[in-house]
């Protein structure tokens, strides 16, 4: 969030303001928060130097480490790689699955300009991945957006190694 881009139309400024309010407003259980979470507002993690920035909060990621014969396994069937360290009910507190043999602390990423990243056509990202200079091995990751379960896979743009396709899913 931070500050809006210069030159926005009145309608675009209104959208920015609505986003800032939504980003800062605590989510409720009725709106889909919980039962496990890291913070009840997006700004609870993304807040330095302003709402939407990076943060001092660290999160724990986990999975099964890659080997020469198998890629990293994110344990999605067990809830994915992010440990949600808070809950509305202590009986459903999340823990790192015993299957995980790799954990890492990650910093909160900055989100300034995240909407601009989503505006880049998927074809541009795919073309860039397919035409990299020698020695670079970036890959396009495809995931189904959380807001359309059972929908079509989309190009990942956010999160660790582009594993999240939309700002809303993030």
For each of these PLM feature ranges, what is it?
Residues 1-170:
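Periplasmic c-type cytochrome electron-transfer domains
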